Amino acid sequence: MKKLVVLFVVIWFGWQMQARQVLFPFPILGGELSNSAVTCVEDIDNVMPRMRALGLNTVLVPAYWELLESTEGRFDFTLTDRVIDKARENGLKVIFLWFGAWKNSMSCYAPLWFKTDTKRFPRAMTKTGKPMEIASCFSANVLQADNKAFTAFMRHLAEKDKGIGTVIMLQIENEIGMLEAARDHSPLAENTYDAPIPKVLWKTLGLRQRKTWRECFGDDPYGEEKFMAYHYAKYVEQLAQTARSIYDMPLYVNAAMNSRGRQPGQYPSAGPLAHLADFWHAGAPSIDLLAPDIYDTGFKGWADRYALPDNQLFVPESRCCENSGVRALYVFGEHRAIGFSPFAIDQSEPQSTASVTEAYRLIRQVFDLEDVSSYRRWGLLFDQEDKERTIIDDKTVITCRHFFTLPWDPRATDGSEWPEGGAMLLRLAKDEYLLAGSGIVVSFATEYEKQFEEEKELGEDGFVAEGKPSKEQKLIPNRFLGKRKGIGFVDEVRVDSLGQLRYLRRENGDQDHQGRHARISCGEWKILHIKLYEY
């Protein structure tokens, strides 16, 4: 009987003190469409088949307040319906992105009637009183208008999709945050800044007595960022409660990273950033995930910050590039991520989307494995600077390296920029592993054997580059009394629809360097089944 792969993801929310069980078609192999990709039905009709062809199972799609309610009080769901219908036709799931009061900090997707009535819908202001293209989150009118449209949207989704489940998750707003100033200085915001800090935050801030925000932080931009984070979260919580009451599904907010040494106000500050997680959890307990949009260098570091016991990792945006595929393998392997989604995949070059398609092909197969959730697994991601990792699995030492640490590919030493290499590594049983990825080499040793290992510089033939007296002879006079790990075989395999490994070919001789390692070269995408033995 064909195995249906469905994963029940249980997420523990420490701030809610309860377990929330979320049903996902796992893993989310996503792609986010460019901002203007679904503003007309013709574009929707064109883009959905292309996303299916790229190997996605989920499309992240904007829902535009300005087009949904171009006239106040009158709602048009033509685009919403078309997205859902075309997704169903192409076997895709949908995550809607509510472009409401804020998109990348700015209120650019608010309707014109909202933008022009700044008396009803006041703007955030700088310290000098300059209004910004950012609606103030302290305005009840702003919240009421945003939430009214969002309520209509959620009701329509429930009518259209409840019981079918094409829409699997929802993002509320997009990259909320302050720019130009660390906090809002409008009159409404100033009054709140002079009010007492809510008691729910006293423990977070280390308070023992009642204080105002101003008494705590003064004009310090990092303190002002905390103030804004809590109040943005309180605003989002109102929309989250609306969603929960109408069509309950997983909810998340996404964050632009505080990278490159910038201070609050120089990036979209006060968003759901890792260092502000306590403020977001306190203000928006109905939000399930705080999700990073990762565009800067150091992908692993950013992902690691959001893979927390109280926050399962989901990467809704990442630069679509030739490294996207191995980055997807990393987050699913290392952090058991819910999903991964390169941004503007509909506008990306073929060499960039190719890596996504290849990686998603491997990831689908890995998650088709029977009992995949029970296997110990790791994610690997390497570049020219960070090119090696050692894993201790019981008493087996696994050395994982970038493929270009081997000498025989000329790109390794000719000054070329190294593409990133990465993989998922799974332990199937004792001395049995599965490696799925690209640009990776893995070797195995016993702990005892590793103590006797010496560094060797290899030549192009894979042997020692230059003969010299053995360090082992000089430094380790004792006899070798332990055991070594050997590679019994390395097979390229695929995973069939029943979750079973199917042999494709044996990788021996030059392909595993006479039993020294298992490897997948840069540009190749494979699944290798590795069996070890001891001698």
Listing of model-derived features with the role each one plays in the protein:
Residues 4, 17-57, 89:
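N-terminal carbohydrate-binding accessory modules
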Residues 4-13:
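Sec-dependent N-terminal signal peptides
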Residues 27-40, 62-80, 127-148, 156, ...:
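The substrate-binding groove and active-site-proximal loops of carbohydrate-active enzymes
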Residues 120-277:
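Polysaccharide-binding and catalytic clefts of secreted carbohydrate-active enzymes
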Residues 329-451, 458-474:
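Aromatic- and carboxylate-lined catalytic core of secreted/periplasmic carbohydrate-active enzymes
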Residues 411-417, 434-535:
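C-terminal beta-sandwich/jelly-roll accessory domains of carbohydrate-active enzymes
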